[in-house]
Amino acid sequence: DSDTTWRLFGQLEWRASEHWLIQGGAMYEDTQLTGNSLTPRIAVNYLINPRHGLRAVYSEAIRSPDMFENNVNWSYRVTGLSTPVYGQNSAQYFVKTRGPGNLDQEHMRSRELGYNGYFVDQALNLDIKLFYDEITGMISEPLRNNQYIASNSNASRFAGTESQLDWQLSRADRLRLTYAYVHAQASNRLDQRLTASNSGSAGWLRNWGQGWSSALFYYGDSALNGYRFERVDTRIAKRLALGSKTSLELAGTLQQRLDHQPTTFADNLYDSRHVVYFSAELEF
């Protein structure tokens, strides 16, 4: 089987007046397996002044089922049989899974009310939003060989708030804070458990001079699929000037888990609670 997907998208912005800014966009998608769709986005911004604004946003999105979900033809071949079958040491497992072949797209509708403000004297940027998202036609069935019956019969709703604070404490120091609260409702209990009710982060970034910089971040959520998540990331970097417009950044990052929980699923367990990796970035 094969699939071909074409997408076309565009965006339009209209400055209606000194205080009103209208933004609109749309994406057209044509998929061989599921047909075509048009998803719009419109945002109305009211600028109280150049540094403070309110916004109302409505958008739609789709997710087309992948080829595995829609057209799977799945079975196992067993080898090394202790008792040969028809003189053969291998045989096809009796369970065979086939996709329905007629799945529709998942549809998401999102509504948002938000505020963004920059406080010059404090060098502080604040963004707060309220949102309500709903997904219909969800394909929620787990991909199991013995009981996979895919359908578009599930739905989810998410309501909550998100906030972000970016504070330039000094020329060298910067503080970032985020927090999100989500109330999730889903027809399939497995979908509902995959959303944490409370999550957030706190970070301190510092420029030490002479190309040295560091970042210290804490990430946490209350329960992701029933498991708490807490981690601290430490990053140290050195930027080397290689020319007037060329530079090389060498960095090392340590990720330290503060909990003893799996990541989302019970069998997602790391051998070590800390991970170290290095990176190199060339800009020219």
Feature annotation, model-predicted:
Residues 15-21, 124-139, 151-222:
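Gram-negative outer-membrane beta-barrel transporters
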Residues 1, 34-40, 67-73, 80-81, ...:
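Outer-membrane beta-barrel translocator domains and adjoining extracellular loop/strand segments
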Residues 56, 167, 171, 175-178, ...:
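Conserved C-terminal beta-signal and adjacent last beta-strands/turns
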Residues 1-45, 172, 176:
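Surface-exposed extracellular loop regions of Gram-negative outer-membrane beta-barrel proteins
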Residues 4-6, 26-32, 58-64, 71-73, ...:
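Transmembrane beta-strands of outer-membrane beta-barrel pores
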Residues 13-14, 28, 36, 46, ...:
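Residue-level signature of outer-membrane beta-barrel architecture
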Residues 47, 55, 87-152, 157, ...:
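Membrane-embedded beta-barrel scaffold of Gram-negative outer-membrane proteins
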Residues 4-10, 26, 38-44, 99, ...:
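Hydrophobic, lipid-facing positions within transmembrane beta-strands of outer-membrane proteins
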